[in-house]
């Protein structure tokens, strides 16, 4: 039995805690807010889109950046297993258009409670993670690389001794020691729910290099005043096409919403991950409907997004 310390009691942290407990480990979860799983409650308009009922291969096709990174994870735990897990935890699921999976209750709280039950044998400590506790790794324990080094692209030699993480110092000043430390803090997408970017700071402390984060799954802003006039207009079964410098780079059918600043909704969030550098490219969107009248009106009222 190993002592496992997990930083973050969101969906990932609770899933990891439950899995580690079932492997016989002693698990402690650090959470810097007073309520685990807060961000779950705002996903899917408060309904929580659990997963998509599709093969892992199709799932990966929709990952814009480095999908290979997720091969092993989705291979070991594909969407079907996610559905099986929640059904085993007592959550009745349904599959909607686009193969999106939601709880029948349409309540994200049911998913949060299921994850808390799954991780109930882990200890949740309400304390933040201020600093990783690092120790020098003895030379005899330094593992050989799993993959032979490519002579054409040799890796840079690290300066100084190899280090291993043996715990975390909490914001309270208390030290939490463990045989394994898992960082599951999420990103910086929703600070009010606890996603404040602590994981980036901890990763840097461990010597990792960070790729600059960019916005994704976000609403889009339009500078066309007519767009604001349609605020509150919700569209279903429309096709959204996104153009970059006149070339179509995304097209999908679904739901979207006009807001006081532009467009939002599931379709828009999916399209946003295809956007590049706004300073280097010009973007515009086209909205089409099976009903020609609606499609024509929406197209005439949309302007490029810069």
What spans do the regions from the language model cover?
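Short hydrophobic core segments
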Residues: 7, 176-189, 256-259
